[in-house]
Amino acid sequence: MTFNGRFRATLRGINIRNASMTSLSLTGSHAQKQTVLGSTPGALGTIPTVALNGVNPLPRYRHNLLFGTLSFGDRWDRIQRRLAVLGRASTGNVVVPFSDSADAFRRMWESVDSASDSVLWQTYICKDDFVGQKTVKKLEEAHRRGCKTELLYDCGGNITGRRRLVGDLKKSGANVIEHRPMWEHFFPYFLRGMKWELSPGIRNHRKILIVDNKLGFCGGLNIGDEYCGTSEGGNGRFRDTHCVVMGPAVMHMREVYEDTKAPKPWKWSLARWRQIASATMNLRYLEGMNVKHDYLEPTTTFVRQGGGVYLRRQMERAERSTVRMMERMRWKRQRERLNRCLLTLAKNLREGQGLVFKAATGKGDDVATTDAGSKRNNEVSHGQWKLMKRRIDEYRQRAIKNAEESFFRRLRVVNPSMRLLEDTSPVAEAEAYGQAHAAVTQVLSCNPHSRDWSIPYAFWQVSKFVHQRLWVTTPYYMPHRKLMRALQLAARRGVDVRILAGSNRTTDPWFMWYASNYITGMLMASGVRVYEYKGGQVMHAKTVVADSIWTSIGSYNWDMMSNKNMEICVCHLDHNLALTMEKQFLDDMNVSEEVNYEEYQRRSLWLRFSSWFFYTALRIAEKFTFRTFWDPDLSSEID
């Protein structure tokens, strides 16, 4: 390969590498609190023209064809249509979030004390400590008042059993359910062909409290001292988010509660996915009326024009290359002829000098003298060549540096139509959309027994069509393939995608931080901003807020196991609640640290190995626990 070929290959490598870099960020400056987004003048559709932190965005023509004609309202109307078939939705609800776990437990205990008809509590972990004993005591008192009382806890989260804790509650006549005892499912799983439907890894991760069918509580809080704030007797180890729902959505939460005890037959899930397919087909049929004008004609025109320009440029380049080649060949022949003449002249000159020297001195040692002179000349030529090679390397490095700087300058060209969006400022169109539409509350659930994957499907749709902002709070993150790609695509097209998770000191279990760290670079390479919580608590919140209009609070972790567990999320389409959750996200972000891409690339070899090891170990454990499970969309194989 020639020098020019090596230089072009190196330059292409720089462009490819820098297209996935997010390192030249505005670290530590006020500009880091801002997100650059582009928009077409006079339209609500976002069309990014620069990348966030040096990330190569989608090609302009592709972005315009896919997203350029969608306004804020069109996007969220489309999202709502896709989410409508996933779970029961209703209006006229009030959703109040709790960021302080002490307030959440105080409100739940007060509701149990004032219950007159029924108290149904479902949790993943119920510990035998002060908070657990107090909760069970209040349930026992409610049952003695004549309320229908039930406590359902998962045996995977309480593997040692809770017989001593719930003994008195059982004696009072209340219903206590131990969900999926581990040893009852451990041996059948291995003896019956390791069918994933029998796997002991399927756990009930839902946290639901329903009081008198009028109040519904949902979120990430288990029952224990670690989950309750200090003002109510706990130690406040976990930073979590819970919510209370009042309105028709409580009955929808009751349906999810009953679904845990008696999962729906597979036919109901099939009917649900038939509805999804039918809705998708109807939507595509309606949208197909404008496909010719909105997509086919612009695409055909672009390809025709682009192809013509490309062909013309290639022909011009080939013609110029041919001319240069002919010139090089002509100069090469001339140099060869000149060299032959010079060599012949030098040879004749040396022979003539030798004859003269021999005739004058009578000595015949002219050959040795000539050879010594040739060696000196060769040594001088070799030194000159080393100097020239060093200069070529210097020029090459300088050219590469200039090309790299030019690459980033092209990416950072600010279009006059671009605007800065402060973190504390809501998305501009969200308020108008919220005023024009009634607040909608939707209860989503996951149940592997009925092949119900509504929550990851909903998050995938929101990530795919989100307009300007997507903020996710999760203890750790190992999203499945489809959701991972949706996050990366959203970030590439200019959406402010942020993930706030625990750090190596605020993640429980601790090894999940290492597994998440393995894919952090993939997310940041696409423009996703990752924050690590550095507060005094362990991050356990599970929330999503999108475009200052849509909020999700529930028990779903963005990891591979939540796809196989029973989960619940309350999704609320309302501008006011979204503003509250955005403020909470910013409060958590203020005590967090953003992961810098350059520092991430320089992490130690031990950290690289640990991240790879735990990520691989979790994937192996997943395949071992759910051996026969296969779904390409829910696969954890994202690399």
From Swiss-Prot:
GO terms for cellular component: kinetoplast; mitochondrial inner membrane; mitochondrion. The chain crosses the membrane at residues 510-528. GO terms for molecular function: cardiolipin synthase activity. Its main location: mitochondrion. Disruption phenotype: Knockdown of the enzyme leads to reduced cellular cardiolipin levels, fragmented mitochondria and inviability. SMART domains: PLDc. Residues 1-18 form a transit peptide. Residues 200-227, 535-562 form the PLD phosphodiesterase domain. Gene3D superfamilies: Endonuclease Chain A. GO terms for biological process: cardiolipin biosynthetic process; inner mitochondrial membrane organization; mitochondrial cytochrome c oxidase assembly; mitochondrial respiratory chain complex assembly; mitochondrial respiratory chain complex III assembly; mitochondrion organization; oxidative phosphorylation. It catalyses: 2 a 1,2-diacyl-sn-glycero-3-phospho-(1'-sn-glycerol) = a cardiolipin + glycerol. The active site is at 205, 207, 212, 540, 542, 547. The keyword Transmembrane applies. The keyword Membrane applies. It is found in: Mitochondrion inner membrane. Its EC number is 2.7.8.-. It is a single-pass membrane protein. Keywords: Lipid biosynthesis, Lipid metabolism, Membrane, Mitochondrion, Mitochondrion inner membrane, Phospholipid biosynthesis, Phospholipid metabolism, Repeat, Transferase, Transit peptide, Transmembrane, Transmembrane helix. Catalyzes the reversible phosphatidyl group transfer from one phosphatidylglycerol molecule to another to form cardiolipin (CL) (diphosphatidylglycerol) and glycerol. CL is a key phospholipid in mitochondrial membranes and plays important roles in maintaining the functional integrity and dynamics of mitochondria under both optimal and stress conditions. May be found in a large complex. Belongs to the phospholipase D family. Cardiolipin synthase subfamily. Partially functionally complements S.cerevisiae CRD1/cardiolipin synthase (CMP-forming), but conversely is not functionally complemented by S.cerevisiae CRD1. This is Cardiolipin synthetase. The lineage of its organism: Eukaryota, Discoba, Euglenozoa, Kinetoplastea, Metakinetoplastina.
